[in-house]
Amino acid sequence: GTTEPLAQSAADTLATITRLNQIGAAGYTPAGGAVYPETTLGRTMRTSAALIEANNNASYNQFVEAIAIDVGGWDTHAGQYSFNNTTGVFTGSMVTNMTALAEALNAFYRDLIVSRGRSVTVVITSEFGRRVGENGTTGTDHGFGNVMMVLGSAVLGG
């Protein structure tokens, strides 16, 4: 081992990459008929599930304690939604983002929590707030309103 902090960080990074390659997330099979969407978030949640499952293998014990996923595209000052009166369907960036989030969370919940009984908690939040009211371009500007969602078997809704 080395005592140089940057050298140790580099060694830790290489060790993590080696472990990730050994896990082989690409070959992961979701449980319970869960289907992860073919979106960036869906693929990331599927990989996260693979890492959590590998953690339950004795050779990777205590490997995964927390996973952070950063998903962009939520800073929507305009075009969050539009409504088609003929079809009765909402479209727009917020609809697209919320659908992708819901589908990925549904697959993750079904795969790990319902089907495998894993004790996993998912926390969804933003690093900045929004104004509650819409601006003049069907968007919202930065403000003090925010949301936090928590999902897991030990979470009591409310």
What is each model feature region?
Residues 1-103, 107-115, 133, 147-158:
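Feature for exported/extracytoplasmic and membrane-associated proteins, marking the mature portion
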Residues 142-143:
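Phosphate-handling catalytic cores of nucleic-acid transaction enzymes
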Residues 121-129:
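Acidic/histidine-rich, metal-coordinating catalytic segments
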